[in-house]
Amino acid sequence: MVGGTRSARVVGRSALSPRVTELTLAIEGDEPFRWLAGQHVTLRPDLPSGAPAAFSIAAAPSQTGLRRLALALSNGSALLAHTEVGSLVGLEGPFGAFTWQPAPSALLVGAGTGLAPLRAIVHDALGSDEATPVVLVAGNRSERDLLWHAELATLASEHLRFRYEPVVSQPDATWRGRRGYVQEHLEEITAGLAPGFRAYLCGSHGMVNACRELLGKLGVTEERIGYEAAA
């Protein structure tokens, strides 16, 4: 069902980082909720004044089945004030074409909660029969702020065709990984990708535009770049 309105119940809330909360929603009713990794939904609190807001689904259908969704919300989101465990929200969607496309290899670049749809795409790609190499570049302020950091590092250790490259802009003295902003590392990272790779970008407008500009200078055409940007 695309664009239909469903009800979903909040069945889980957990801290992904000091700034982000993960919500788990259980779809009400008998009909399965079908989506593609990378798509998003619009949520509306079950209140007369509840303003709708769009959120990317942070899980692939193969992870949660067709009855549950996982979303990542910044702690400043007004929606969090009305989504205690047990509460109902209206749900519309799924929407969007920010989904997996066949290519010799894939570059995924996300910052902040922009990592949510990319996490879904990673799980979907690794769970398929394809052998496409996938590189995920994930940016945030500090190691504590990196979303699903341990999970993604574990996936990289378990799948030879998946590489995880976390980048921290405000590292402490113990950080041994990449420093700065994601776009500052793309030239080096893309040098190891197969020609004709496809890029997926998700984050702030500034990050997405900087990555698009750099990839263009590296010869990546707009047709090979999928992106979603938020303010």
Predicted regions and their residues:
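Reductase modules of NAD(P)H-dependent flavoproteins
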Residues: 2-7, 132, 137-231
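Ferredoxin-reductase
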Residues: 2-87, 140-142, 167-170
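Short, conserved phosphate/pyrophosphate- and ester-handling motifs at nucleotide-, phospho-/glycolipid
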Residues: 38, 114, 204
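Short, Lys/Arg- and Gly-enriched loop/turn segments at beta-strand edges
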Residues: 49-58, 96-108
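A short, well-structured juxtamembrane/interface segment
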Residues: 76-79, 91-100
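Short, glycine-rich nucleotide/cofactor-binding loops
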Residues: 107-115
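Histidine-anchored nucleotide/phosphate-binding helix
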Residues: 115-127
